[in-house]
Amino acid sequence: MELAFRESLKKMRGTKSKEKFSQELEMSRSNYSRIESGKSDPTIKTLEQIVKLTNSTLVVDLIPNEPTEPEPETEQVTLELEMEEEKSNDFV
């Protein structure tokens, strides 16, 4: 998991010990420690428990790794449609 998530998790845990927080999440301290240290990713169920326990909101965002460009076939179809529209507008 990203550093921002781990830092947020530590901040939300506040002054509670890892032992206490993991008990409230109904998981072992070692499993919680692996999540907080970034050695393991939490399950959706665990994320839901963290949200409930910390009265927070979970935001998931999908960001492409690199810009996606339309396939050449898609560009061709788009160009053909534009040409057809221009032709039909010429007759109006």
Swiss-Prot record:
Q: Tell me where on the tree of life, at the top rank, the source sits.
A: Bacteria
Domain annotation HTH cro/C1-type: ranges: 9-62
Mention any Pfam family matching this sequence. HTH_3
**What keywords does the record list, in alphabetical order?**
DNA-binding, Plasmid, Plasmid copy control, Transcription, Transcription regulation
DNA-binding residues: 20-39
Using the UniProt annotation, give all residue ranges assigned to the region (Disordered): 1-40, 63-92
- A GO molecular-function descriptor: DNA binding
Q: What does this protein do?
A: Involved in copy control of plasmid pIP501.
* Name of the protein in question: Plasmid copy control protein CopR
Name its species. Answer: Streptococcus agalactiae
Q: What is the lineage of its organism?
A: Bacteria, Bacillati, Bacillota, Bacilli, Lactobacillales
Gene that produces this protein:
copR
